Curated annotation (Swiss-Prot):
Keywords: Cytoplasm, Heme, Iron, Iron storage, Membrane, Metal-binding, Oxidoreductase. It comes from Mycobacterium leprae (strain TN). GO terms for cellular component: cytosol; membrane. Belongs to the bacterioferritin family. Fe cation 2 binds at E51, E94, E127, H130. It comes from the Bacteria. This is Bacterioferritin. Gene3D superfamilies: 1.20.1260.10. The keyword Zinc does not apply. GO terms for biological process: intracellular iron ion homeostasis; iron ion transport. It holds the Pfam family Ferritin.
Length: 159
């Protein structure tokens, strides 16, 4: 089934964002684990896997539309050296994604591609949850201070 070139371009742009997020979140997860924030690291790792599921769904859609998924392009990773920097970097990716997705959904509907629009709407719902989580963590960090916030995130060995 031949897809609209504009829809395919949008889907490949979104695929690039998902591939970038997978790598950034996974690296942040491993850094958090190394710093002793194992529960936080697990949450970040799960977010990386969520982005992988998005990439898979987008890839399937591009292939169905007789397009070629571009796995050779990836955006620059923003690697945070502190928890705050990591949350801010991850939030920046999410904001960029949302600025593309919402107009993209409208464009898909205008091009009579409701299936791609629904796929992107599902991704928006997931990204909104991640944005809420990241904004909450940054707000908590602001209220508690970075040291106290970080102390709350350290995993304690089982007793």
């Amino acid at each position: 089934m031949q897809g609209d070139p504009d829809v395919l371009r949008l889907l490949n742009e979104q695929l690039t964002s998902e591939l970038t997020a997978i790598n950034q979140y996974f690296l942040h997860s491993k850094m958090q684990e190394n710093w002793g924030f194992t529960e936080l690291a697990e949450r970040t790792r799960v977010e990386s896997f969520d982005e992988m599921r998005h990439a898979e769904a987008i890839t399937d859609r591009i292939l169905l539309l007789d397009g070629l998924p571009n796995y050779q392009r990836i955006g620059s990773l923003r690697v945070g050296q502190t928890l705050r920097e990591q949350f801010e970097a991850d939030l920046a990716i999410e904001y960029e994604v949302m600025s593309r997705l919402k107009p993209g959904i409208i464009m898909c509907r205008e091009k009579q591609d409701s299936t791609s629009a629904v796929l992107l709407e599902k991704i928006v719902a997931d990204e909104e949850e991640h944005i809420d989580y990241l904004e909450t963590q940054l707000a908590l960090m602001g209220q508690l201070g970075e040291e106290l916030y970080s102390a709350q995130c350290v995993s304690r060995p089982p007793s």
